[in-house]
Structure formats: C-alpha cells, structure tokens
Amino acid sequence: MKNFIIRLFTAIAIVAVQVLCTYLSPYSFAGLFLLLTALAVNEFLKILSHGGQVQVSRPLMIVGSCYLFFAFWLNSLAELSMLVLFVPYLLFLLFCYIRELFSNNSNPVFNLGAMVLSQTYVVLPLSLVNMLAFGHYDCFSASAPFYAIPLTLYVFIWLNDTGA
C-alpha cells in the first residue's frame, strides 16, 4: 500500500508540473520539453548500449537532440527560415556520420543506426509537439490559447493509458 501511495503522489506531481509548464508560457513549455528530450535520449541510448554492441557518444547526441527541439520551437514561434534553422542540424548529422565511419569502433553501422533511431524515434515526436502548440492553423481562431492542443493531447494519452 505504501508503494502505491508513493507512485500516486509522484504521478500527481509529474502531471501537475507538465500541465503547469504547458499552461504558463511558451518558455516554460520549451524548458520542460527540452529537459524531457535530453532525458529521453539519454535513457534510450543507455538502453541501446546495454548489450555492448552500440557505443554512441551520448553527450553529442543529447546536444544535437536539444538543438533539433530548439530549432522546431524557434520555427514555430518566431517563424524563422527553415533553411537557417535546420542546416546546422543537417551539418551535425553529417559530422556524426563521418565521425562514426572513421572511428575505430567494431560496429559503425550499429552506431549509425542507433544515432538515427534516437533522433527519429525519440526526438522528432517531442520536437513536433511544438508544431501542435504554436503552429498556425486555419481551423482555430487566433484567440485560441497555444496550450489547448497539447493539453488535449495529454488528456487523450492519459485516458488511453488508463483505459488500457
């Protein structure tokens, strides 16, 4: 029973922080999701490297992941040019690709796969939440708050998890 109560209060605290950061401002939203992106990529790469075959530079991947999230956030909020924001990320990917091909690792293909998988499977969905929150859609009025779609998404995910 004690374990259940600890889990319950932890879940309530996490939900409260997530809803509050989403509701307050675009900056708190970005801060929370930037932190979630970094932690998720770190955990994902830790799981992949557990068997010993994959050896990816986690700090480098975390920096690249945070940049991708930040580029989507800036693109959604400030409507800066996609070229200006995403060319540095493409150069980062090219650097990682070349670095891995010329490294002395025994499995460079596994490492490249882990890098690409971490960016597409973990970072891209978290980064695209910015497009949901700050995108300009014709079906919504201009007075609709930015947090309406992400909070609705949270509710649907929580209801789905609870019902499963």
Residue ranges of predicted features:
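Membrane-embedded alpha-helical bundles of polytopic integral membrane proteins
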Residues: 1-164
